[in-house]
Amino acid sequence: MPAAASTHIGMFMAWLALHGMAQPDHAPSELHERMITPGEYLRRHCVDQIDPFMLTDTGNAFTSAAYRPYLRRFGDVPVVARYDSTYETPDTWETYDEVAILIEAMYDEWRSAIGG
C-alpha cells in the first residue's frame, strides 16, 4: 500500500478539526498552525481513522451524510486526478487546500439540505 494511502481520510478529518467539528482533544494547535500535514495529524491524533467519539454532533452528522459521497468525488479534485490512483495523492497542505474546496461545497450543500 502506498505511503499516502490514508491521505483522503486525513484531508477529511483535518477539515472537520479546522472547522470546529472535532472534539478539542482531536484538534491540536499543530494542525491549526500547519506544523503537521493532515496525514500526520490522522496518524498521531486519530489512529488513522475517523471515530464518532472524535467528533462533535455536527461533525458526526455531516460525516454520516457526506463521507461516502466525498470518497466518490475525491478522485475528481484536480490535484488528485493527476495520479493513477487516489492512494498516490501527496499528503501536503497544497493538496488539502484543493480538497478543502470540495469538502466546503459538500458542507454547504448539506447545510442547505437540512435547513441550516
Residue ranges and their predicted role:
Residues 31-102:
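Amphipathic protein-protein interaction modules
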Residues 1-45:
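N-terminal low-complexity, intrinsically disordered segments
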Residues 19, 23, 49, 110-113:
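Short secondary-structure junctions and interdomain/linker hinges
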Residues 104-116:
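Glycine-rich, aromatic-bearing surface loops/beta-hairpins
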Residues 10, 20, 39, 59, ...:
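Residue-identity detector for glycine
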